[in-house]
A protein has these predicted regions:
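Extended ligand-binding regions for polar small-molecule ligands
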Residues: 63-75, 132-135, 139-158, 231-275
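Acidic, polar ligand-binding/catalytic clefts
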Residues: 70, 74, 79-145, 156, ...
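Alpha-to-beta junction loops
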Residues: 78-79, 97-106, 149-150, 189-190, ...
Length: 288
């Protein structure tokens, strides 16, 4: 999945990357208007995905985007076929734009590198901390109890901007944004550092926070950040990404999302993804 930091930071100033993709993507050019050639394969669901990017995807089919791809393929009555490529610089250029696949299963709404479908979920960054360590009840970054605390944050993401505005960056521990997840997992390391006490808390994209906080070790508190009064936006709508001008394919996927929203929600909730409605209320049961 392409995390939402890129779309947010790009409008800010210097094209800071979302969870996964980066500057090399800017080389992808849209087809000229009128060049409406539908290149979608109708005999399989061709998906572009990262082979080592849990909880989103891996080459064993264990991620929630893998599971959602299976729902889509079942609805279309075709098998899933993957093109594997690390979600870093050049991902879209090397996969979707190169016509090696027809859909990216997780893409922040509003990014111009793809044509977005309707969103199939909305989530937010989350604060993670150990219960009983002095932060119980903290539910926003402006809480005075976070002052002076060592907080982990992925560099270049929207919460880093919010933390800077609140004076929380000087003591923060940064984690890298662009990595090859086959060899490094900053989100997983952040959660491990919270458990060990190396940091007091961490701020991480909600789907990663929910998954890694539940993956072994002591129970951690995961608080979706929905109450920030100022600073960068922390909640994002996530869509499927398809090639520009493939409007029929987009409409087909939109209809499929509407039909199978409850099944998609069930997958996301099982992975601990904090789901938000448009009023930023938590969704705790699949929508039907």
């Amino acid at each position: 999945m392409r995390r939402p930091a890129l779309a947010a930071s790009r409008s800010a100033a210097a094209a800071l990357l979302s969870v996964l993709l980066s500057a090399g993507l800017a080389t992808y050019a849209r087809p000229a208007e009128g060049q409406r050639v539908d290149l979608v394969n109708r005999t399989s669901l061709r998906v572009c995905a990262d082979p080592a990017n849990m909880p989103f995807s891996n080459d064993k089919g264990e991620g929630f985007e893998n599971k959602i791809a299976e729902i889509v393929a079942a609805e279309l009555k075709v098998p899933v076929e993957y093109t594997w490529f690390p979600q870093a610089t050049g991902f879209i250029r090397q996969t979707l734009a190169a016509k090696r696949c027809d859909v990216v299963m997780g893409y922040a709404q509003g990014d111009e590198l793809v044509l977005n479908t309707n969103p199939y979920y909305r989530s937010t960054y989350a604060l993670v901390y150990r219960p009983g360590a002095g932060l119980d009840g903290v539910d926003h970054l402006a809480d005075a109890r976070l002052s002076g605390k060592r907080i982990g944050v992925v560099a270049g993401t929207p919460p880093a901007t919010v933390m800077a505005g609140l004076g929380l960056i000087q003591q923060a521990k940064p984690y890298p944004l662009l990595v090859d997840r086959r060899y490094d997992s900053p989100g997983e390391r952040m959660i491990g550092d919270i458990r060990s006490g190396d940091i007091d808390a961490g701020v991480l994209w909600g789907p990663m926070a929910g998954y890694f906080a539940a993956s072994g070790g002591d129970k951690l508190k995961v608080v979706p950040l929905t109450k920030e009064a100022a600073g960068a936006r922390l909640a994002y709508r996530i869509t499927f990404g398809v090639r520009h001008l493939e409007d029929d394919w987009k409409r087909q996927l939109n209809a499929l999302i509407a039909r199978r929203q409850g099944d998609i929600d069930a997958v996301l909730l099982a992975f601990g993804v904090p789901l938000l409605d448009e009023q930023s209320n938590l969704i705790t049961q699949p929508r039907r």
